[in-house]
Amino acid sequence: MRTTIDVAGRLVIPKRIRERLGLRGNDQVEITERDGRIEIEPAPTGVELVREGSVLVARPERPLPPLTDEIVRETLDRTRR
């Protein structure tokens, strides 16, 4: 997918990708330069530990996108390379 960097160095992530990754305005991303390439990925979501009865439960600090079969397959494919 092709996009343009403006004169201020800003880059628009296409809507389809933002929606699939659950990214919204003001969300943070991690940018890495590796082997002459730019990698952009969602910044890790912080969690809050909440006690539910005798169990500690990790709750994300912001809503996360639903985990779909497609996301699981893509993640497995990426990690197996």
Curated annotation (Swiss-Prot):
Disulfide bonds: none annotated. InterPro entries: SpoVT-AbrB_dom (IPR007159), SpoVT-AbrB_sf (IPR037914). The keyword Transcription regulation does not apply. Pfam families: MazE_antitoxin. GO terms for molecular function: DNA binding. Residues 1-45 form the SpoVT-AbrB domain. Keywords: DNA-binding, Toxin-antitoxin system. Physically interacts with cognate toxin VapC40. Antitoxin component of a type II toxin-antitoxin (TA) system. Its cognate toxin is VapC40. Belongs to the VapB family. This is Antitoxin VapB40. It comes from Mycobacterium tuberculosis (strain CDC 1551 / Oshkosh).
